[in-house]
Amino acid sequence: MADLIFQDWGLINYDEALKKQNDLVEKVHTEDLPGFLVFCTHPPVVTVGRATQAGDVFSWNGPVVEVTRGGRATYHGPSQLVVYPILNLAHVRKGRKDREINPYLKVFEDAIVDVLKTYGLTGIEGRSSAKSSFNRADADDTGVWVNDLKIASVGVGVRKWVAFHGAAINLTFDEKAFLGLRPCGFPSEVMVSLEQLTGAKVDVGEFKEKLKRRLLEVL
């Protein structure tokens, strides 16, 4: 159902992107639009969600932004593709009724899983029965995993029944990413990139096109 409006913001500071998200949330609510699908990339920044705990950020020396999304602390940076669906949850979609959040999250994560399949990878969404070898008892179970490694972090917020925030997908390897924090409550070693998993250079444009096509089909 390709009725979302797609925008690619390119490289954009997190604060500016958050303001633009908030503006789109108001637009979707006021005009009763289906929503927007936004792709972008951020300079290095750590965001802390509503469930962040003491000790999640312990030696990160870059900018930190408090946000209203669910989940805990995570990193955003140039090695990632960040995806922000600004979605009107009051509109019924295939696979979910109106004003349902968890079914939306599953569809969102499963779309990322579907794209990973095209790279020969078997991903699984975070609330499945699959468990990491890392201790998950006190960690955030959202996101997309390949075996016991996490390739995508997912956290959303909802205001006026419009979903915003979204996912950060690790595409290329950056040894400095996630240092000084426990992303989503896990040790930083749990995070992995598409480049590491495939052992090949990632065509970012190709990945973006695949994910854009899939998300516009299912959201």
From Swiss-Prot:
Subcellular location: Cytoplasm
Pathway per the UniProt entry: Protein modification; protein lipoylation via endogenous pathway; protein N(6)-(lipoyl)lysine from octanoyl-[acyl-carrier-protein]: step 1/2
InterPro entries in alphabetical order: aa-tRNA-synth_II/BPL/LPL, BPL_LPL_catalytic, Octanoyltransferase, Octanoyltransferase_CS
Gene Ontology CC entries for this record: cytoplasm
Gene3D superfamilies listed in its UniProt record: Bira Bifunctional Protein, Domain 2
UniProt catalytic activity: octanoyl-[ACP] + L-lysyl-[protein] = N(6)-octanoyl-L-lysyl-[protein] + holo-[ACP] + H(+)
Gene Ontology BP terms: protein modification process
EC nos: 2.3.1.181
Site (Lowers pKa of active site Cys) residue list: K150
Keyword Acyltransferase: yes
Residues annotated as the enzyme's active site: C184 (acyl-thioester intermediate)
Gene Ontology MF, one: lipoyl(octanoyl) transferase activity
Entry-linked HAMAP family: LipB
Biological role: Catalyzes the transfer of endogenously produced octanoic acid from octanoyl-acyl-carrier-protein onto the lipoyl domains of lipoate-dependent enzymes. Lipoyl-ACP can also act as a substrate although octanoyl-ACP is likely to be the physiological substrate.
Protein name as it appears in the record: Octanoyltransferase
Lineage: Bacteria, Pseudomonadati, Bdellovibrionota, Bdellovibrionia, Bdellovibrionales
